[in-house]
């Protein structure tokens, strides 16, 4: 199975469409979305083409292809309008001989690694790495 990994579109219709176009051109099977879907948060400026209602429509059309974890800007209110689960803090994916721990990165990240076995890949909104060696990798 081919996974397309994305995160942090923060309600931007522009970046959501770019993500979907890339997902389709890569011919990936599933999107692993690492949070921060609709809201930009109080610390951030509005993203380009901020339109969370359009993002809701675009992503709900792909609901059967999305596996999502909660980002630090995602809330129960967001879950009310999205037709796929978004509120898990992490997920564990088994794909062939690989085990992947996926999270947004606000709880576990490069400086605060989750307690994982050495053969498990850890994927956050900004990094993919193998905790046993602390080596950053760009693909799985």
Task: For the regions a language model picked out, list residue spans one by one.
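Core catalytic region of metal-dependent phosphoesterases/phosphodiesterases
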Residues: 2-95
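Hydrophobic transmembrane alpha-helix bundles
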Residues: 67-77, 103-116
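Beta-strand-turn-beta hairpins that frame and shape the catalytic cleft
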Residues: 1-3, 92-101, 135-139
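Structural motif
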Residues: 5, 32, 102-104, 123
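Conserved beta-sheet core of the metallophosphoesterase superfamily
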Residues: 99, 106-140
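Fold-independent oxyanion-binding glycine-rich loops
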Residues: 8-9, 72, 105, 125-127
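Short acidic/glycine-rich loop or secondary-structure boundary segments that cap or lie
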Residues: 40-43, 76-79, 101, 110-112, ...
């Amino acid at each position: 199975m081919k996974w397309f990994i994305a995160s942090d579109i923060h309600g931007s219709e522009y970046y959501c469409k770019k993500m979907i176009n890339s997902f389709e051109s890569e011919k990936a099977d599933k999107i692993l979305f690492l949070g921060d879907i609709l809201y930009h948060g109080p610390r951030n400026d509005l993203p380009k083409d901020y339109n969370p209602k359009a993002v809701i429509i675009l992503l709900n059309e792909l609901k059967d292809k999305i596996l999502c974890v909660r980002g630090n800007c995602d809330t129960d209110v967001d879950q009310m309008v999205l037709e796929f689960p978004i509120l898990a803090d992490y997920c564990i994916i088994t794909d062939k001989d690989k085990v992947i721990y996926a999270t947004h990165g606000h709880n576990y990240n490069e400086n605060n690694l989750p307690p994982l076995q050495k053969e498990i890949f850890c994927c956050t909104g900004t990094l993919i790495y193998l905790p046993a060696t602390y080596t950053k990798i760009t693909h799985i």
